[in-house]
């Protein structure tokens, strides 16, 4: 005997605001600060004398790649591309969680490069590296908060 069909489920698209309201609603309000602090990190690292290319190369890779992918996510929300996929929320949460972890590793490596640059270079390079380290930790916090807020939203 055949079992009855399962009850029909309906997929209700989420309530993603459009326009300026996107930047005022949690979790989407994290996009602009992520982009701003990410931009500051990679421009400050690029503006300094690279002490250890392997360490600061990883910082540049993480910050620049995260900046570009976050910009693509923001544009997909602004233009409504997310409506084509049902699993966009999971993808967004996984991306921001993974990026938070990668940014933490980049921030720690940037701090190490900053400590080394204190003894080797002029003070201006040290100050720029210090600011890049601080902004990298802020970006890490923003990405992790974004991941949790999109997951629990």
Swiss-Prot record:
Chief site of localization: membrane
Compartment(s) of residence: Membrane
Membrane topology: Multi-pass membrane protein
Superkingdom as given in the UniProt entry: Eukaryota
Span of domain MARVEL: 22-153
Keywords, sorted A to Z: Membrane, Transmembrane, Transmembrane helix
GO cellular component annotations of the record: clathrin-coated vesicle; cytoplasmic vesicle; Golgi membrane; membrane; membrane raft; plasma membrane
UniProt cross-references to InterPro entries, sorted A to Z: MAL, Marvel, MARVEL-CKLF_proteins
Coiled coil: none
Transmembrane segments: 22-42, 59-79, 97-117, 131-151
Any Pfam family the entry gives: MARVEL
Protein name: MAL-like protein
Organism: Homo sapiens
Organism taxonomic ancestry: Eukaryota, Metazoa, Chordata, Craniata, Vertebrata
